[in-house]
């Protein structure tokens, strides 16, 4: 356990650290990538260029320091991060690298304010948190390896089918090269693609599993990512998957990870899934798995897209609507093309609104799951809050660094 002295010091310096948190995290990544270039491949460089990773880490540090006297409230965040760490192959030996560079970055930014007493307290606090992560991640690794067909590290898969879902989304159907069994996954989980690219070392990328959990294959559905900011590169791995990977090619995959999941066998109330853009992928897996396990389940699926050209899984959503007597779907285009509305390709034009959720879902009783781009997520979260939906009935997933939805 942490000493009372360490807790007191960390609480005292929290305002100062919070005021400089993003400066500290930017310096941290600069130092670490220079001193330990071997860890650079763990990090999505698009998120580095956009500043999203630095902002997310700054938020995590501030949250830990704020709640250092009651770390139990951080356990949901610990689970999310531990799952992500396992997906990337983070091991106990990586934690000292992070710790030493973080302490050095704090010293660089805070200068003389980072007294030996403060550095010692932050070091103890970091070590305490690192031990929590190492323990949880070890349990996840063990669980993955012990499943029928399970594995740690990477396993070679073959692309058995490649399907264009829209102008910007392509699906890849994957089976093990060794023809061995596939371990079960929880609807909503993701797998990690480990891929070499001419402009970067082997780069792990997480992609949600987008098909029913009962299928004899894994399916990922990849959006062709464009640069997030002017000087950043386009998504290297997503573009390589679209342009360079064909049926018959081999891909190295990590096992399923992730805590944004649903258990179809235990559903006891209506489920509402609200998807924006490529955020449809984990929710489609949830929907198909729920209906497969219980055809009479009450399910409401709202899918938002720009227009019919970029609307992925339109046919699958129509089939889903016919899969059970209590399945209800709605498609909303915010920038419909001429004919999209008239030809029935979408049900409504505009954005997801509080009124739409009120009128088309049992919002007073349902559990809500939503996923999509940050502005979409902020809007949906705000709508649910205005409708009085209890937070314990709301689950959501960001693609990329997880950030606060409530405050800009």
Swiss-Prot record:
Keyword Chaperone carried by entry: no
Residue numbers spanned by region Reductase: 149-408
A single GO BP: nitric oxide catabolic process
The EC number(s) this enzyme carries: 1.14.12.17
A GO CC term assigned to this protein in UniProt: cytoplasm
Residue ranges annotated for the Globin domain, each copy included: 1-138
Catalytic residue list: 95, 137
Classification via CDD domains: FHb-globin_3 (cd14783), flavohem_like_fad_nad_binding (cd06184)
One Pfam family named in its UniProt record: NAD_binding_1
Domain FAD-binding FR-type: 152-263
Binding site for heme b: 85
Entry annotated with the keyword NAD: yes
Catalytic reaction(s) noted: 2 nitric oxide + NADPH + 2 O2 = 2 nitrate + NADP(+) + H(+); 2 nitric oxide + NADH + 2 O2 = 2 nitrate + NAD(+) + H(+)
Binding site for FAD: 190, 205-208, 398-401
Record: residues binding NADP(+): 277-282
Site (Involved in heme-bound ligand stabilization and O-O bond activation): 29
Note on cofactor: Binds 1 heme b (iron(II)-protoporphyrin IX) group per subunit. Binds 1 FAD per subunit.
Residues flagged as site, Influences the redox potential of the prosthetic heme and FAD groups: 84, 397
Cofactor(s) recorded in Swiss-Prot or TrEMBL: heme b; FAD
Keywords assigned by UniProt, alphabetized: FAD, Flavoprotein, Heme, Iron, Metal-binding, NAD, NADP, Oxidoreductase, Oxygen transport, Transport
GO MF entry, a single one: heme binding
Family: Belongs to the globin family. Two-domain flavohemoproteins subfamily.
Free-text comment about domains: Consists of two distinct domains; an N-terminal heme-containing oxygen-binding domain and a C-terminal reductase domain with binding sites for FAD and NAD(P)H.
PANTHER family given in the database record: FLAVOHEMOPROTEIN (PTHR43396:SF3)
Name by which UniProt lists this protein: Flavohemoprotein
Organism of this sequence: Rhodopirellula baltica (strain DSM 10527 / NCIMB 13988 / SH1)
């Amino acid at each position: 356990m942490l000493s009372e002295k360490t807790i007191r010091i960390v609480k005292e310096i929290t305002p100062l650290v919070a005021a400089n948190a993003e400066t500290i995290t930017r310096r941290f990544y600069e130092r670490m990538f220079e001193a330990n270039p071997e860890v650079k491949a763990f990090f999505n460089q698009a998120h580095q260029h956009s500043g999203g990773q630095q902002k997310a880490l700054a938020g995590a540090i501030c949250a830990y320091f704020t709640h250092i006297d009651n770390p139990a409230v951080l356990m949901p965040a610990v689970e999310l991060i531990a799952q992500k760490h396992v997906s990337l192959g983070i091991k106990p030996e990586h934690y000292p690298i992070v710790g030493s560079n973080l302490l050095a970055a704090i010293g660089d930014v805070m200068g003389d304010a980072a007294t030996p007493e403060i550095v010692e307290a932050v070091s103890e606090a970091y070590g305490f948190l690192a031990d929590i992560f190492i323990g949880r991640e070890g349990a996840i690794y063990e669980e993955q390896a012990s499943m029928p067909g399970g594995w740690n590290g990477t396993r070679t898969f073959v692309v058995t089918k490649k399907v264009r879902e829209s102008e910007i989304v392509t699906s890849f159907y994957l089976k093990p090269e060794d023809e061995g069994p596939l371990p079960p996954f929880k609807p909503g989980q993701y797998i990690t693609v480990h891929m070499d690219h001419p402009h970067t070392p082997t780069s792990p990328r997480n992609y949600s599993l987008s098909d029913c959990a009962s299928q004899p294959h894994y399916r990922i559905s990849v959006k062709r990512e464009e640069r997030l900011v002017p000087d950043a590169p386009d998504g290297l791995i997503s573009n390589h998957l679209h342009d360079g990977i064909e049926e018959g090619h081999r891909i190295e995959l990590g096992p399923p990870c992730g805590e944004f999941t649903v258990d179809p066998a235990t559903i006891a109330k209506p489920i509402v899934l609200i998807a924006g853009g490529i955020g449809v992928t984990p929710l489609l897996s949830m929907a198909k798995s729920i209906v497969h396990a219980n055809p009479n389940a009450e399910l409401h699926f709202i899918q938002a897209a720009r227009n019919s050209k970029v609307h992925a899984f339109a046919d699958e959503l129509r089939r889903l609507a016919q899969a059970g007597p209590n399945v209800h779907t709605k498609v909303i285009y915010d920038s419909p093309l001429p004919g999209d509305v008239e030809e029935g390709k979408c049900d409504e034009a505009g954005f997801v609104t509080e009124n739409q959720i009120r009128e088309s879902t049992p919002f007073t009783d349902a559990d809500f799951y939503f996923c999509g781009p940050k502005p979409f997520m902020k809007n949906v979260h705000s709508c649910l809050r205005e409708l009085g939906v209890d937070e314990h009935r709301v689950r959501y997933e960001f693609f990329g660094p997880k950030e606060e939805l409530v405050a800009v």
